[in-house]
């Protein structure tokens, strides 16, 4: 199931306006709606979710950024919730994020879709591709045969992230075993809320 863009609401991150939502009972959300709400709540904590933004606004934000800089915004296409806008060697470009059957993946042509990795959250999807780009990239490459390489390296934040969040990112980059650290339980709970490196 691909969710469609609904009416605007003011529930975006850091004062941004979001346009996505889910249908269903207001009393008891379905497991699907609860899963989606959790994933979108997680996204709102990143600092690089911009909410409602046009293609041209995204291009303007990324125009002077280095290659690999990206942001997440609400999709302007009614069949998708979100879009990655990223600066490539050919300039800013956009890639839709598909949500289907409780999973997120990059939009692609049909013959490739089944091979693309799927994730429970948008942040996990982005974290995976950022780590993959770190592992594979050694430096800028010139595009061959008209192809443009897509690298996700650095998020473009809506504003300076809180120091707490930056510390959490650093800890996540250094260890995968939060519960083994000599820290108070409350702090470990905070670290567990966001287990990603980006």
From Swiss-Prot:
List of residues that carry Phosphoserine: 30, 52
A Pfam family reported for this protein in Swiss-Prot or TrEMBL: SOCS_box
CC annotations in GO: Cul5-RING ubiquitin ligase complex; cytoplasm
Residue segments, region Interaction with AREL1: 1-75
Bias (Polar residues): 14-25
Keyword Cytoplasm attached: yes
Keywords: Cytoplasm, Growth regulation, Isopeptide bond, Phosphoprotein, SH2 domain, Signal transduction inhibitor, Ubl conjugation, Ubl conjugation pathway
SUPFAM superfamilies registered for this protein in UniProt: SH2 domain, SOCS box-like
Cross-link position per record: Glycyl lysine isopeptide (Lys-Gly) (interchain with G-Cter in ubiquitin): 173
Compartment(s): Cytoplasm
Name of protein: Suppressor of cytokine signaling 2
């Amino acid at each position: 199931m691909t969710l469609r863009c609904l009416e605007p609401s003011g529930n975006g991150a850091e004062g941004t306006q979001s346009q996505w939502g889910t249908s269903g009972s207001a009393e008891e959300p379905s497991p699907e709606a609860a899963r989606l709400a959790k994933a979108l709540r997680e996204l709102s904590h990143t600092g690089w979710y911009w909410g409602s933004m046009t293609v041209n606004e995204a291009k303007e934000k990324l125009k002077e950024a280095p290659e690999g800089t990206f942001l997440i915004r609400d999709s302007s296409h009614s069949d998708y919730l979100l879009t990655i806008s990223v600066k490539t060697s050919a300039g800013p470009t956009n890639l839709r994020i598909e949500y289907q059957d409780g999973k997120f993946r990059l939009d692609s042509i049909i013959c490739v879709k089944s091979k693309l990795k799927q994730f429970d959250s948008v942040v996990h999807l982005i974290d995976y591709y950022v780590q993959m780009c770190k592992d594979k990239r050694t430096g800028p490459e010139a595009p061959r045969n008209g192809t443009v390489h897509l690298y996700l390296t650095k998020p473009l934040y809506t504003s300076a992230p809180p120091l707490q969040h930056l510390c959490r990112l650093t800890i996540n980059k250094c260890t995968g075993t939060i519960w083994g650290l000599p820290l108070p339980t409350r702090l470990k709970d905070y670290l567990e809320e966001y287990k990603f490196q980006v």
